Regions:
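Short, solvent-exposed loop/turn segments at secondary-structure junctions
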Residues: 35, 62-63, 103-106
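Active-site-adjacent beta-strand/loop module that shapes the phosphate/pyrophosphate-binding cleft
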Residues: 100-133
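A structural signal for short, well-ordered beta-strand segments
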Residues: 43, 96, 125-127
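NUDIX/MutT-family hydrolases
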Residues: 122-128, 133-167
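Short acidic (Asp/Glu) patches
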Residues: 27-29, 75, 80, 102-113
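Acidic, metal-coordinating catalytic segment for phosphate/diphosphate chemistry
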Residues: 1-42
Length: 172
């Protein structure tokens, strides 16, 4: 029997960083989200010993390394770059592991809102860690941490656990 191409594994409603009302779905798939609706990309660096490298954002705490896709980049390029900037890791054997699908049913596009509306995506990838450079804390991130247990108490967002598990299954 074939595995479903796309699996919605978690749903949240009225997430604070999006125009409300909204729905955010965590989708596990090896397909890419539509590029024209994807403005951010993330990378889960997976170590040979089964750990994953997680960024430590100064304001938000533990998170998967990622950020905005620049005009001259693909989502994969941006995820690779962000992983290096936020964790000091370089990766290879990169594979897509899923995306956040964010849908807003707000009455209109809020003033200054810079993302596709009413539907947008955040793309997630996983890759095998090739190298970890020494990391110097900066105004965005502190030194990254290696997580071995996706139930680690320091993980406060369900999406980290879900994409972390998907990364481990895809890369190891």
């Amino acid at each position: 029997m074939n595995k479903p191409k796309e699996q919605v594994v978690h749903v949240e409603h009225d997430v604070a960083y999006l125009p409300t009302p909204n729905t955010v779905e965590v989708v596990i798939t090896n397909d890419l989200a539509p590029a024209e609706l994807t403005k951010t990309a993330f990378m889960v660096p997976v170590c040979d010993d089964g750990g994953i490298i997680i960024a430590v954002n100064q304001r938000r705490g533990l998170e998967i390394a990622g950020g905005h896709i620049e005009a001259d980049e693909t989502a994969e390029d941006a995820a690779f770059r962000e992983a290096f900037e936020e964790t000091g890791t370089t990766v290879s054997n990169v594979v897509p592991i899923g995306f956040l699908r964010m849908t807003s049913t707000a009455a209109g596009v809020p003033e200054g809102y810079a993302y596709p509306f009413p539907l947008s995506y955040q793309q997630f990838f996983a890759g095998s860690v090739d190298n970890v450079e020494p990391y110097t804390d900066n105004d965005e991130c502190s030194a990254p941490v290696k997580i071995f247990d996706m139930q680690d108490r320091r993980i406060t967002r369900k999406s980290i656990t879900l994409f972390g598990n998907a990364a481990l299954k895809s890369v190891l």
